[in-house]
């Protein structure tokens, strides 16, 4: 996978992570199983800061939430994302893999697929959260959305029980 056909183009792999155990496992899986493929191109580790979800405060106060509260929530999401990426980068270094880290703000499903296209990713790797069928219907599934909408092959890594 490191060299692509006649062009000799390095393949780009993106691992989408969040704070879940399943995304951490997906990163570890890539580092253990695709390490030789990552020697000619940095691994892209990607996380998404969700939009601030403080709409419940609107109902309680019958107005807009204070700007300070919005900024505090946004700052918390930013710090969490940066911490996740820093830990992921350290794990990559321990495996001898160069990583490029990127954080975006938005809906995770859409942001991941947009990043795949923008960064010309050749393989997207996501973890499986193991939601049941009912949860997937009501909550949606990032991995399912990416499988149907990403402009590259998608590998869903599920931790064996």
Predicted regions and their residues:
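Structural beta-alpha unit
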Residues: 1-9, 64, 75, 79, ...
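Small/aliphatic-rich secondary-structure junction motif
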Residues: 2-68, 75, 90-100
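Glycine-rich, Arg-bearing micro-motifs that act as flexible, cationic patches
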Residues: 12, 123-148
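Small-residue (primarily alanine) positions within well-ordered alpha-helices
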Residues: 23-26, 116, 143, 150
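Generic structural signal for helix capping and beta-alpha/helix-loop junctions
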Residues: 52-53, 109-111, 133
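Short, flexible loop segments at boundaries between secondary-structure elements
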Residues: 152-161
